[in-house]
Amino acid sequence: MNNYTTINVKNRTAINVKNKDMKMNVTAKWVFTFLFVAAASMLHAGAYTNPVLPYDYSDPDVCQAGEDYYMTSSSFNCIPGLQILHSRDLVHWRFVDAALRWRVPGTEQAASDSPEYGCGVWAPSIRFHKGRFYIYYGDPDRGVYCVRSQATSGAVEAFPLEWEEAVLVKPGKGFIDACPLWDEDGRVYLVHALAGSRAGLKSVLMVCELTADGLACKTESRIVFDGHPDHPTSEGPKFYKRNGYYYIMHPAGGVATGWQVCQRSRSPYGPYETKVVLAQGKTGVNGPHQGAWVGYWFLHFQDVGVAGRIVHLQPLRWQDDWPVMGNEGEPVSQGNVPDKAVSTIGENANPRLFREEFSTTDLPLSWQWSGNYDARYGFCNAAQSMLRLFSYPCDSIPASPSLLLQKIPANRAFTVTAKVRFTPLKKITGHERAGLIVAGRQSYMLDAPANGEWTWLRVTVSQNHDCQFYTSTDGKTYIAVGKPFRAVEGVWIGAKVGLYCTRDRVKINDSGYMDVDWFEIR
């Protein structure tokens, strides 16, 4: 994350665009609401098209509580982490919570230090057990953690929940991709994988027994499956039990090109029979694997490069006590789900238009900071319906924990626009910067003018992720700035777009700031 390019206002070409200066009035909001509801009604006749979530939700897992489904996914270094999405039909998803609100557990460095890109929260599993939600995940540098909710009914109306402090269940480097199983006899098991970069071994799956509360190891882990040589990079296991069989479902073969494997045994420690249950075959869906079995469905991701890992839904049936996924083991492009009322609780996780006007005191859950949270990053000034970001010290903009970012949509072109006003601190003129960022392994920034005046910053992104920055002084005429560039994915995640307000590490007792009137992805 050390590579970056800053675009200043040079080599400009003017174009005229529709004026988006004004905040949406009540009538406009009703129009957008009507259009969204109408579109949802037309699409929600039980049919769906994959991907059901064309955004980066890496390593998704799902559990069921009553008639409600809950999803979480890898959040790595981003905060809030372990975002929780809700659905009634596995197709329409909305944000309802995040289990890690402030920091990645175990990170001892100050929030002002650089984020640990690609580290932190890997491949979580979520379960609802005896009135509590449990989320287990592996941190490749620290071990397996469990985050547990306070007692709850499981109904979506109870969200957001109170979450206990994360517990380090299994300390040690290289333990990743953990999933629990509560057996009928009260015993609790944990399956996990190994990160080769830390453990010096990969492609094996391990099982240990946990204490009754699921918060500590009762036994040492032992290998129950070796993926060498037929199933290399076996990881991301999920643990289930059905008809007396213990099942471990996991991906193998690599993120972009692998397949889904199912293991079954009469004992949690094996020996296990092995079968490939989902693969690309003759379809265009590469690497259809790593996800969740729930009811008659299997959710998994597809790595699409710059936009990250997007979520697909496959039908699932059972034959001879083996799962049959998709269309005889190949992913489907369309399907049908039971027609259920779409929940309106929470923020839509798959909007065609995303527009944030910062009219409340809390940021919506779709926003994530690039590192551990610090209140000095900024705040939502609901009284004036705007966001204020303070300049935060860092070594470089991509290395700042204070980047405020959004996932990008896959498989379509889109435009990002923000109306901003950058007011630097005169005492440190030239040491502060603020603006619009396209973040990834290579990051690109468009600096806002340091004049305390409102300006419009824009980036257009093609379906192939070719980008062009623009600026405007009136929201009507936009001027191309700099050369076109291509967005680049991040470390284990897709590229993101968002905002920055940073400064060099100079000694000062105050800060400049950038106000954001609104931010839009369309």
Residue ranges and their predicted role:
Residues 7-8, 54:
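Hydrophobic residues within membrane-embedded alpha helices
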Residues 2-4, 11, 19-21:
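Intrinsic-disorder-associated, low-complexity terminal segments enriched in Asp/Asn/His/Tyr and depleted
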Residues 22-32:
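Bacterial N-terminal signal peptides that target proteins for export
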Residues 2, 45-522:
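Carbohydrate-active catalytic/glycan-binding domains of CAZyme proteins
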Residues 18-19, 37:
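Short, linear, compositionally biased motifs with a strong N-terminal bias
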